[in-house]
């Protein structure tokens, strides 16, 4: 269990450093069970719940996502589920997640609704369909 926590806190610190490099002020709330990082820059507020796994499939408790959404609404920030999945950093709008039970399933299909770090901070590149053909 301790190793699992260490992996998660390492990812939180990595994301915190990336956000700070981009000019965000960041607060890490370790052990919060619902909100791990709060980042702000010039009136923009981003709120993250961070999860990491080396498995091809894992589960996130529905209550963790509900806490993220609730806190974000009260605080006035934009919520993101930040996932380090098989070494790749992905960000998901929690409103796009769906569940039939107590947990959300995270697997390769999550990439269909995920965005990358630069899209989260507003520096993403938008592609036109013509560019892909």
Curated annotation (Swiss-Prot):
Its cofactor is Mg(2+). The active site is at 32. InterPro entries: Hjc, Hjc_arc, Restrct_endonuc-II-like, tRNA_endonuc-like_dom_sf. It catalyses: Endonucleolytic cleavage at a junction such as a reciprocal single-stranded crossover between two homologous DNA duplexes (Holliday junction). The keyword Endoplasmic reticulum does not apply. Pfam families: Hjc. GO terms for biological process: DNA recombination; DNA repair. Its EC number is 3.1.21.10. It is an enzyme of class 3 (hydrolase). Keywords: DNA damage, DNA recombination, DNA repair, DNA-binding, Endonuclease, Hydrolase, Magnesium, Metal-binding, Nuclease. Mg(2+) binds at residues 12, 36, 49. Homodimer. PANTHER family: HOLLIDAY JUNCTION RESOLVASE HJC. HAMAP family: HJ_Resolv_Hjc (MF_01490). This is Crossover junction endodeoxyribonuclease Hjc. It comes from Methanocaldococcus jannaschii (strain ATCC 43067 / DSM 2661 / JAL-1 / JCM 10045 / NBRC 100440) (Methanococcus jannaschii). The gene is hjc.
């Amino acid at each position: 269990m301790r190793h699992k926590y260490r992996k998660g806190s390492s990812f939180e610190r990595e994301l915190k450093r990336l956000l700070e490099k981009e000019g965000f002020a960041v607060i890490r709330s370790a052990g919060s069970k619902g909100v791990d990082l709060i980042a702000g820059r010039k009136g923009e507020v981003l709120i993250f719940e961070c999860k990491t796994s080396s498995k091809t499939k894992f589960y996130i408790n529905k209550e963790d996502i509900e806490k993220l959404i609730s806190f974000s609404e009260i605080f006035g920030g934009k919520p993101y589920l930040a996932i380090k999945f098989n070494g790749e950093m992905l960000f998901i709008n929690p409103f796009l997640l769906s569940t039939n039970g107590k947990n959300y399933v995270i697997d390769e299909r999550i990439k269909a609704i995920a965005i990358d770090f630069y899209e989260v901070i507003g520096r993403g590149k938008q592609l036109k369909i013509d560019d892909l053909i």
